[in-house]
Every structure is written in structure tokens, then in C-alpha cells.
């Protein structure tokens, strides 16, 4: 209880109802409250005034908050909640947020009719110290509204009177300014100074160039640590200040150099937000000193060229060459490349014999899309290093103000960041608030005062800082870096600055922000402001500043000359990616010995005797085991588990995430078993042997965009891991369309970034309506080109087994899109023999007619893909005049293989492509030209006819009856029935 009292501190007003209720309990029965409270209340009761137990009431200063007070909360929780005001208030002086009455009010005594008001000072020690505690706490909570954050001075700043932060609000006056304050308190810290000195200190700390929001943090230790750090002085030596100035000179100098040499060229200058580059560089140095070995940075286009050079270490000549020649990669690679301000880079930085690896992630213009990719890449690197404390590899994300509060992926990424499967030990966020979103003012882009409200979802500390005060920016950065490393959580530094030019250098901002840009035009740069400060303090003279600029320009002139003959380099396929090829040289043999498969399968079906698994699963596992040992055909789930188990036993780590993927949306996988008694779990795939690799499976939060982005990022770090994301239904994958369009399908040709990510998308038309039928197969086929990925619609367990193993055993890495089954998971014909998974077997992209037929008697050949095959197969029955061929892989289209099969049917009169999807969806529009080409190559003078659903705006009908009619119609039409 003593600790609770300490945390409750000076009995701030939010606890009034809580303390009053305790006091009433004490009056009724002193033994009903803790001993410490008994002693506390005894001090009140022992007063000479007689108390009437039915009417005595304690009045304590309070604050008005939005949430209702929960009187059952512990004092620790109360100390961290936003609390409601008490239901009553005995005295309220003025329209303020807190009562100025600081006394214990003893109501009228029934026996004497007298009343008495006892000064609180008499019962709580020195009154001024008590009031000072309240003042400190109030400054901490609300003084950010008074902070000088806007370098343009456009904001009308509030005053102390506006916020009731003058000393009179706390029952103090000027006569007490020289009175000594002596506070020893766990929450507000230790203070021993004059009241005037306290006020000065609080003003300097909380109403200067830094404003903080820490009250959303529930952990008292974290909050105290942050306030104490902020209240501590940070000093910079003369040499430190010169280094800072030099950094500012280089940031501004490079932007101006490009502006002069390439007028009008887009570069998305950082000018106005120069401090952000210096802060990022400082954060890296600080992180290195704290044991960080690698940092991955994600950011948008603004300030990227300066980040590439000043922060990450890309040669200036390499960036300048991009302006001169336009080439970013060697011509012989024959890739599309991307604009300069989207490209990433990697390098090593060494300071004081300490080395840190830096990576700037490639990104598109889609703002904030890179956030989960960076997080996933960091998690993968941490796993490679065995960095379970998440302290050796970290992420830095740089956001724009309008994007941070406008893009939904920010909230998705923040929400998932504390979850076990996605935790990377916190991210250092810099929000570069230049007070504009292209042409939109802040009032048009958000309803909140700050752009950082999303960060409160995870109770991240937020430090707002004036971008013109470089030393304040560095102090905030220092606190943020230390916090992330100490507590392993996200932290946000918002740098309020401005944008010197328009959205790009060719844009005219005066059309829409005339007032702002009139101020900006006459405003000294951050570098000039800081140089003037150093001149005034006698650290440098004007010649020193001029010389710094001249020397840096001379350096850039040399880099410019070298850039004229610079040949771009391709930084990829190094490190863990050595041995991986861009071009697939041969088909991998993916089969596994039959005995090995049976042994692995048996092991997968073993459940510990003391593990209380659901009885239905016991039967399921027994049936699987019997299937394997008796050499019966296996189903899809068993084949998938065998693929995983064989890879794990060969040393390949596997990571599978997605909504409900542990069990499987359709209750087929059951790779995580749950104890029915104590909720513990057992994962058979992690209990194969002592030498096996790791199987990580996690049910994700309800997100597609951020989760798929995270897994894509994870796949970039290590090609030797099998990384999978499974959609709950394929229909929901388009919630992550940006990841598919901007990253998965195009990252290799834009940025030379390869990925072996596997995407499982349940897809089939089964009468479940327009939202549970289609993974939009057509969209993936539209994205497919230049051997950028595999798009498959497999129909057999053998196919999924080989596809999964091929992702690792191939000598290249391409994303694999799988239209995965739903009803086929339990279809009696959707099975494979173990021999089809056995030694010297491989994935077959095309499956010929399964029955033995006389090709001379075949009058019709139907090509199809996916579940519709089984519908056709069952309806065809014993008709031996129709051959059905399956395409298990749609892209890349195996032209030669298909042509060789069709040659067998050169006497066939009719060729049909059959699909379940509407004509404007599915594979038809992609595949029709390919199919007719292979007919010609096979020497067959014919064309493929379409059979399927008619064109439709919606993927499927909502009625099961209507679905069944459509399905029967297309099947009969295809079969000629």
C-alpha cells in the first residue's frame, strides 16, 4: 500500500472520489482499509474539530477528463487513466480545468451546528510544495500547447492564462516566488529550489522549442523516465556545435547545388526541414553507441537524396550522375529502374572503430506503404542474428505530416507493432511536418491539432519540436533513441518545419499558400539561424561559416566532374543472396523419398500423452497417420504439412502468418494444437527432431495491407527462408493491392529486389456470394510479365507439395501466387499418391487427361484450371470422347509443354477453355492469345472457344440457387450435354 500511495503522489484531484470513498469506509470501520490509509485518515480524525461521519467529505483539487471514473481501479491504474471529474464539487473558482480550493472541507457537525475548514497544509506538510507538485504535473500534461513549435510563427500561441498555468491557478502568488520548494516524490521527482526557479525551469522545459505528449503512456516507470530525461539539461560543446553547423551546411549545400545545376528538375528538396537529416544521422550514431549493428530506414521521396548521401553514404557523384544520364542501373541488366528519389541503398558506417550497416529501403510514391516492409525486414534480420531482445537491428521511419494521419496503413502498422509475431523492439518515427500536404493546408488534412494522433493507439511517447531549433531537435532525438533502446517500444519525434519550394521544384506554391510563402521567402535558413547563434556566442566568426560553405561546394564540384563518367552499379545478390540467380536455369527436383515422407508424417501425427487435445482432432490425426502408413492417397492438408516438414528437416526456416492460419480458415491445417484444459499449445512441426529448423506460425491481426507488407519485407532479408502469407479468403487480398502492385510484382525490375514470398489465396466459386468466391485471379495475371512471379491454380496435393518446395530448391526467387482450395480440401478426388511426391518427382505445370484414352477418338479438348476441373470430371462420367487438360501454373505460361500435349489431339474438332469466373475475370483474357498461339505451334488449324459465366460487374451471385443454375449451365455447355 505504501507503494500505491507513492504512485498516487500528492493526491491529485482525479482521485478525489476514490479517496473520499476510502475515507467513508474508514469512518465506518477503520480496519476495512489498509494500515497506511488508517494512519493517513487518523491525522484528519485526530483534529480537534468533531466530525459527523455521515457528512464528512474530503475536497481535493481535480481535473476534468472525459472518461467516467472507475472507483474499483487500483491507485496505480488511477494514476495513469484519464479520469472523470468528481460527481460533486464543493468549491470551483472560475472557469478552469481544476479547482483552486485546496483544503479539507469538514461539513456541519450535527450536534453543534458548527463548521470548520482546515488548511490542507496542516495535514499534508508544506502547502507550497503540495501546490508545486500539482503545477509540475499540469505543466507536464498541458504545456505543450504553449510550446514555440512553429518556425513560421503562423500559429496563434496560447498563453498561460488561456491554459490556467499561471501560479495563481495553483493557489500561489508572487509573494511566494522566493519561497523554497522541497519535493521528494516518485512521480514528479525531486525538486529543491525556489518557486521562481521552478517556474523558470518548467517554462524552459515545457514551453520552449519542445512540446511533449506522454500522458497516453500507462507504464509509470516509462513516463517518469521520459519526464526526467526531458527535464535534464543537454549541453553541446563548442566542437559539437561546429559539427552540427557543418551538417546543416552540407544538407542545405547539396540541395542548393542540385537546384543550381539542374534547375526545375524534381528532387523533392528537404530545405526547411534540414534538421531532420541531421537528426537521422545523429540517431544512427547514438544507436551505434548503444550496441545497434544494423538500421533499416524507410521514408518517402522528400529529402531522400540528402538521406541517400548524408545519412546512408551513397556517393554524391552517383546521385548527380542520375541527373546527368538518367541511368540508375547498368544497361545490361535490362530492367525498368525507377526515379532517383525512390531508390534505396546500403552501406557501412564506421565511427570510433564501431561499424553499423545502414539500409534505405526502396519505395514507391505510395506514401507510408514502405512502413510494414521495413518492419518485416528488420524482424527477419533480428531472427537471422538470434536477436531475441530486438536490440541489435532497428528501424527508422520518416513520415510526412499529411500522410501520417491520412494513410490507413499507418494505423494498421502501428496496431500490429506490439504483437508478438510483428514486434521488432520499437520503431523510431520522425514525422517531418512541413505544414502542407502538396497544396492542402493542415486544416484540410486532419481534424486534430497534431498530425501524430495515430501514435496514441499504442501509447507511444510523442515529442513535438521546432525544426529551426537544431539543438532542441537533437535533444528530442537523443531521448527518443534512448527510449526505444531501453523500453523496446515505438517513439515519435515530430519536427515542425516548412517546405522551401512547392511540392516539387517546378511547382508554384504561391497560388494556394501566398501568406505562408511570403514568410518563407524572407526567412533565414536553419543553417543561417544556427550560424548566427554561434557567431553571437563567440564560437565561430562569419569567415568560418563562409569557409565551410566554400569547401563543401568545392567538394561537390569534384563529384560533379566525376559524375560525368560514372557508371551505375548494381548492388544486389550479395551476402545471403549469393548463389541466387535472376534467371531460372532448370526445374528443381522437389520430390522426397517415400520412407522419409512416411516417417515425417507419422511424427506429425504424434500428440503428447499429457496434452488434452480436442477429441475430433485425435480422430483426424489418427486418420492421417493411417493414410500414410497404409500407402493410401493423401489430401491437401497432409501434402502441405509434408512439404513443410521436409523443408524443416532440411534446415529451412518457415514463417506462415495470416488471419486464422494456425488452424486454417477451413479447419484443415491444425498446425497449432490447443490444450482444452489450460490453453497451452503444441506445434507438431516444431517437434520433428532436435536438429530441425524453426516453424513460426501466427494468426495475424485483422489487416491485409500491413501484414502482407510485413511478410514481403521479411522475405527480402533471407532467400533461404520460406515465407508465406495466407488470406482468410482470397477476396480480401485486394485490401493489400498496393503491396501486390508496387512491391511484389515490380520490385525486381524497378529496384533489383527479389522475393520468394508465397501468397495463399482461397479461391473458388461455391455459391458463397460475391465476397467469398474470387481472389481476382485476373489481376495477378495482368501484373505478370518479364518472369516476375508465378501465378498458379493447383488442383492436386502433389502440386502444392512441389510448389512449396520449389520456392526453396530453385536457384532463383520469385513471388508465388497460389489460388488455394476451399471445398477441394476435402474432395474425394482431390488426392495424391505418395509416389507423386517421391524421389525424382517435380512440379508439373500442365496435367494431361488422367484416363487412358485413344486420342484419335477425342472430339473435344477442354483446358481449365482449378476447382472447375473436378466439376467437369464428375459430370463427364464415362464419356471417352472428351479430354480434360489442367493448367496448374498459369504464369509463366508453359508454351512448349502445352503445345506438345495438344499435338496428340490434332484430330480434335473442338477446343474449349472453361472457367468458373465471369468472362471479364479469371484467366480467359490473359490466356486466349497464348492458347491460340500454341494451337498454331502444334499445327492445328483451330481456335479456343470460351465457356464460362457471362461478363459481370460482380464476381458472383449472392444466391446459392442462382449459383447452382449458372454452374450447371456452364458445365453442360463445356461438355456438350
Swiss-Prot record:
GO annotations of cellular component type: cytosol; oxoglutarate dehydrogenase complex
Annotated catalysed reactions: N(6)-[(R)-lipoyl]-L-lysyl-[protein] + 2-oxoglutarate + H(+) = N(6)-[(R)-S(8)-succinyldihydrolipoyl]-L-lysyl-[protein] + CO2
Entry EC no(s): 1.2.4.2
Keyword Glycoprotein: no
Sorted UniProt keywords: Glycolysis, Oxidoreductase, Thiamine pyrophosphate
Any one GO BP annotation for this protein: tricarboxylic acid cycle
Cofactor(s) needed by this chain: thiamine diphosphate
GO molecular function: oxoglutarate dehydrogenase (succinyl-transferring) activity; thiamine pyrophosphate binding
Ranges for domain RPE1 insert: 77-125
CDD domains per the UniProt record, alphabetical: TPP_E1_OGDC_like (cd02016)
Record has Hydrolase as a keyword: no
UniProt cross-references to InterPro entries, sorted A to Z: 2-oxogl_dehyd_N, 2oxoglutarate_DH_E1, DH_E1, KGD_C_sf, ODO-1/KGD_C, RPE1, THDP-binding, Transketolase-like_Pyr-bd
Role noted for this protein: E1 component of the 2-oxoglutarate dehydrogenase (OGDH) complex which catalyzes the decarboxylation of 2-oxoglutarate, the first step in the conversion of 2-oxoglutarate to succinyl-CoA and CO(2).
Subunit structure: Homodimer. Part of the 2-oxoglutarate dehydrogenase (OGDH) complex composed of E1 (2-oxoglutarate dehydrogenase), E2 (dihydrolipoamide succinyltransferase) and E3 (dihydrolipoamide dehydrogenase); the complex contains multiple copies of the three enzymatic components (E1, E2 and E3).
Family (UniProt): Belongs to the alpha-ketoglutarate dehydrogenase family.
Protein name stated in the entry: 2-oxoglutarate dehydrogenase E1 component
Provenance organism: Rickettsia felis (strain ATCC VR-1525 / URRWXCal2) (Rickettsia azadi)
Encoding gene per record: sucA
Amino acid at each position: 500500500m505504501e507503494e500505491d500511495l507513492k504512485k498516487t503522489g500528492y493526491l491529485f484531484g482525479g482521485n478525489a472520489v476514490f479517496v473520499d470513498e476510502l475515507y467513508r469506509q474508514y469512518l465506518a470501520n477503520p480496519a476495512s482499509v489498509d494500515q497506511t490509509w488508517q494512519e493517513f485518515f487518523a491525522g484528519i480524525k485526530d483534529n480537534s474539530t468533531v466530525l459527523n461521519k455521515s457528512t464528512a467529505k474530503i475536497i481535493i483539487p481535480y481535473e476534468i477528463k472525459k472518461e467516467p471514473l472507475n472507483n474499483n481501479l487500483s491507485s496505480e491504474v488511477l494514476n495513469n487513466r484519464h479520469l472523470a471529474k468528481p460527481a460533486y464539487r464543493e468549491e470551483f473558482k472560475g472557469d478552469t480545468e481544476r479547482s483552486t480550493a485546496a483544503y479539507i472541507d469538514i461539513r456541519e457537525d450535527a450536534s453543534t451546528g458548527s463548521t470548520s475548514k482546515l488548511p490542507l497544509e496542516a495535514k499534508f506538510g508544506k502547502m507550497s510544495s503540495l501546490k508545486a507538485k500539482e503545477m509540475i504535473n499540469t505543466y507536464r500534461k498541458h504545456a505543450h500547447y504553449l510550446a514555440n513549435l512553429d518556425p513560421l510563427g503562423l500559429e496563434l500561441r496560447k498563453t498561460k492564462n488561456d491554459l490556467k498555468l499561471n501560479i495563481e491557478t495553483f493557489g500561489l502568488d508572487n509573494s511566494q516566488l522566493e519561497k523554497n520548494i522541497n519535493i521528494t516524490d516518485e512521480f514528479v521527482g525531486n525538486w529543491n529550489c525556489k518557486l521562481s526557479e521552478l517556474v523558470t525551469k518548467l517554462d524552459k522545459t515545457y514551453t520552449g522549442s519542445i512540446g511533449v505528449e506522454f500522458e497516453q503512456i500507462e507504464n509509470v516507470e516509462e513516463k517518469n523516465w521520459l519526464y526526467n530525461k526531458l527535464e535534464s539539461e543537454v549541453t553541446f560543446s563548442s566542437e559539437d556545435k561546429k559539427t552540427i553547423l557543418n551538417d546543416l551546411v552540407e544538407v542545405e549545400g547539396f540541395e542548393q547545388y542540385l537546384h543550381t545545376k539542374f534547375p526545375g528538375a524534381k528532387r523533392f528538396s528537404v530545405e526547411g526541414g534540414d534538421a531532420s537529416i541531421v537528426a537521422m544521422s545523429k540517431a544512427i550514431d547514438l544507436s551505434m553507441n548503444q550496441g545497434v549493428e544494423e538500421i533499416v530506414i524507410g521514408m518517402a521521396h522528400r529529402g531522400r537524396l540528402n538521406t541517400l548521401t548524408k545519412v546512408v553514404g551513397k556517393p554524391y557523384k552517383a546521385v548527380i550522375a542520375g541527373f546527368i544520364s538518367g541511368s540508375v542501373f547498368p544497361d545490361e541488366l535490362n530492367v525498368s529502374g525507377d526515379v532517383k528519389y525512390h531508390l534505396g541503398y546500403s552501406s557501412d558506417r564506421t565511427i570510433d572503430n564501431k561499424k553499423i550497416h545502414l539500409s534505405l529501403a526502396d519505395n514507391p510514391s505510395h506514401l507510408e506503404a514502405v512502413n510494414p516492409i521495413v518492419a518485416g525486414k528488420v524482424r527477419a534480420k533480428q531472427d537471422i542474428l538470434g536477436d531475441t531482445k530486438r536490440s541489435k537491428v532497428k528501424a527508422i521511419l520518416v513520415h510526412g505530416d499529411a500522410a501520417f494521419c491520412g494513410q490507413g496503413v499507418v494505423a494498421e502498422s502501428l496496431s500490429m507493432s506490439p504483437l508478438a509475431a510483428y514486434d521488432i523492439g520499437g520503431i523510431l518515427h520522425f514525422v517531418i511536418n512541413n505544414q502542407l500536404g502538396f497544396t492542402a493546408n493542415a486544416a484540410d488534412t486532419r481534424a486534430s491539432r497534431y498530425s501524430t494522433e495515430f501514435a496514441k493507439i499504442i501509447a507511444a511517447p510523442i515529442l513535438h519540436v521546432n525544426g529551426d531549433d537544431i539543438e532542441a531537435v537533437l535533444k528530442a532525438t537523443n531521448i527518443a533513441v534512448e527510449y526505444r533502446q531501453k523500453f523496446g517500444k515505438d517513439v515519435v519525434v515530430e519536427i515542425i518545419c516548412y517546405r522551401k519550394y512547392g511540392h516539387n521544384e517546378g511547382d508554384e506554391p504561391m497560388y494556394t499558400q501566398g501568406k505562408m510563402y511570403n514568410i518563407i521567402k524572407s526567412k533565414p535558413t536553419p543553417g543561417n539561424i544556427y550560424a548566427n547563434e554561434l557567431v553571437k556566442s563567440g564560437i565561430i566568426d562569419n569567415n568560418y561559416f563562409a569557409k565551410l560553405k566554400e569547401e563543401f561546394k568545392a567538394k561537390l564540384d569534384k563529384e560533379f566532374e566525376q559524375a560525368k563518367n560514372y557508371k551505375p552499379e548494381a548492388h544486389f545478390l550479395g551476402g545471403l543472396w549469393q548463389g541466387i540467380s535472376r534467371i531460372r536455369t532448370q526445374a528443381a527436383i522437389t520430390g522426397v523419398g517415400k520412407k522419409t515422407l512416411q516417417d515425417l508424417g507419422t511424427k506429425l501425427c504424434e500428440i503428447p500423452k499429457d496434452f488434452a487435445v480436442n477429441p475430433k482432432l485425435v480422430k483426424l490425426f489418427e486418420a492421417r497417420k493411417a493414410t500414410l502408413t497404409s500407402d493410401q492417397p493423401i489430401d491437401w492438408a497432409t501434402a502441405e504439412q509434408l512439404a513443410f516438414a521436409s523443408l524443416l528437416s532440411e534446415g529451412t526456416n518457415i514463417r506462415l502468418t495470416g488471419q486464422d492460419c494456425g488452424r486454417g480458415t477451413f479447419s484443415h491445417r491444425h498446425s497449432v494444437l490447443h490444450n482444452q484444459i489450460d490453453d497451452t499449445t503444441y506445434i507438431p512441426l516444431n517437434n520433428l527432431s532436435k536438429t530441425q529448423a524453426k516453424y513460426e506460425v501466427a494468426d495475424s491481426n485483422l489487416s491485409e495491407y500491413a501484414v502482407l507488407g510485413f511478410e514481403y519485407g521479411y522475405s527480402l532479408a533471407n532467400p533461404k527462408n520460406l515465407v508465406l502469407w495466407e488470406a482468410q479468403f482470397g477476396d480480401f487480398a485486394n485490401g493489400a493491392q498496393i503491396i501486390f502492385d508496387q512491391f511484389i510484382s515490380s520490385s525486381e525490375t524497378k529496384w533489383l529486389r527479389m522475393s520468394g514470398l508465397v501468397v495463399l489465396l482461397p479461391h473458388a466459386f461455391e455459391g458463397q456470394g460475391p465476397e467469398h468466391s474470387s481472389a481476382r485471379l485476373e489481376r495477378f495475371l495482368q501484373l505478370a510479365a518479364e518472369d516476375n512471379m508465378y501465378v498458379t491454380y493447383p488442383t492436386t496435393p502433389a502440386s502444392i507439395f512441389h510448389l512449396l518446395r520449389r520456392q526453396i530448391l530453385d536457384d532463383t526467387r520469385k513471388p508465388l501466387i497460389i489460388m488455394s482450395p476451399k471445398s477441394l480440401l476435402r474432395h474425394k478426388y482431390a488426392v495424391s499418391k505418395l509416389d507423386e511426391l517421391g524421389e525424382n518427382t517435380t512440379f508439373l505445370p500442365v496435367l494431361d487427361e488422367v484416363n487412358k484414352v485413344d486420342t484419335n477418338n477425342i472430339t473435344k479438348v477442354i483446358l481449365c484450371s482449378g476447382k472447375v476441373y473436378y466439376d467437369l470430371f464428375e459430370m463427364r462420367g464415362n464419356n471417352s470422347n472428351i479430354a480434360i487438360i489442367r493448367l496448374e501454373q498459369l504464369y509463366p505460361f508453359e508454351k512448349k509443354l502445352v503445345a506438345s500435349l495438344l499435338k496428340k489431339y490434332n484430330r480434335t474438332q473442338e477446343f474449349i477453355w472453361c472457367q468458373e469466373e465471369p468472362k471479364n475475370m479469371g484467366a480467359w483474357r490473359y490466356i486466349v492469345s497464348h492458347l491460340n498461339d500454341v494451337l498454331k505451334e502444334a499445327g492445328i488449324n483451330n481456335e479456343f472457344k470460351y465457356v464460362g459465366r457471362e461478363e459481370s460487374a460482380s464476381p458472383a451471385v449472392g444466391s446459392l440457387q442462382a449459383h447452382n443454375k449458372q454452374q450447371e449451365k456452364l458445365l453442360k455447355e463445356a461438355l456438350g450435354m
